[in-house]
Amino acid sequence: MFNDIGALELVTLVVLAVLVFGPDKLPKVIQDVTRTIRKIREFSDSAKQDIRQELGPEFKDFEFEDLNPKTFIRKQLDNEELGLKEIRNGFDLKKEMAEVTDAVHGRDAESSSSGSSSGSSSAASGNGRVDMSKKPEKPEKPGKTDKPAADDRPPFDMDAT
């Protein structure tokens, strides 16, 4: 109940209580508040016992905390039958990122070696950096123009517009 109250907030509440009720009435107010909280807890516990008795022995393991959606979902997802813990343990983000990094570095090495063999030194420089500026590609066929052919256009979908 009071898990999310910090030290500064607690001190603020105490100072505010002293200012509002005064040092003379404060002990009486604290006793009244604790007595009220105790009665509310007793009423809640007796209501839970009455509900459990009326539900019968089938619901002996019923927990009222499960009615809270967060705890219900947490309890259901931590169930071993689903195997979610195995999936979480098998998912290693650092390992996957290292694999992706290695794959990218492997492609950079391949492109720099193939770029230097084909005579294109602008693809990768000697220090391992890639030239990111756009440069027009040389046409493969001497008769090919800069305009894309009708086959190169993306398909047009009437339903998408």
UniProtKB/Swiss-Prot annotation:
Gene3D superfamilies: 1.20.5.3310. The Tat system comprises two distinct complexes: a TatABC complex, containing multiple copies of TatA, TatB and TatC subunits, and a separate TatA complex, containing only TatA subunits. Substrates initially bind to the TatABC complex, which probably triggers association of the separate TatA complex to form the active translocon. GO terms for biological process: protein transport by the Tat complex. It is found in: Cell membrane. It is a single-pass membrane protein. Keywords: Cell membrane, Membrane, Protein transport, Translocation, Transmembrane, Transmembrane helix, Transport. This is Sec-independent protein translocase protein TatB.
